Amino acid sequence: MKVRSSVKKICTKCRLIRRKGTVMVICTNPKHKQRQG
């Protein structure tokens, strides 16, 4: 899980979602998991 100030989609399978006010990227590739904070 990467914690970044700006989260971006890395590949086409990345999905931007909001969980409890936090922007997250979920993907089939675990390396692409990101969280804003």
UniProtKB/Swiss-Prot annotation:
Q: Which family does it belong to?
A: Belongs to the bacterial ribosomal protein bL36 family.
Which keywords does this Swiss-Prot/TrEMBL entry list?
A: Chloroplast, Plastid, Ribonucleoprotein, Ribosomal protein
Q: What is the lineage of its organism?
A: Eukaryota, Viridiplantae, Chlorophyta, core chlorophytes, Chlorophyceae
User: Can you say what this protein is called?
Assistant: Large ribosomal subunit protein bL36c
The entry's cellular-component GO terms read: chloroplast; ribonucleoprotein complex; ribosome
UniProt key word Transit peptide: no
What domain of life does the UniProt record list for this protein's source? Eukaryota
Where in the cell? Plastid, Chloroplast
| Species this chain originates from | Tetradesmus obliquus (Green alga)
According to its UniProt entry, the protein's GO biological process terms are: translation
Record-linked PANTHER family: 50S RIBOSOMAL PROTEIN L36, CHLOROPLASTIC (PTHR42888), LARGE RIBOSOMAL SUBUNIT PROTEIN BL36C (PTHR42888:SF1)
Q: Name one GO molecular function term.
A: structural constituent of ribosome
Q: Which NCBIfam families match?
A: rpmJ_bact
Task: Report the main location listed first in the record.
Answer: plastid
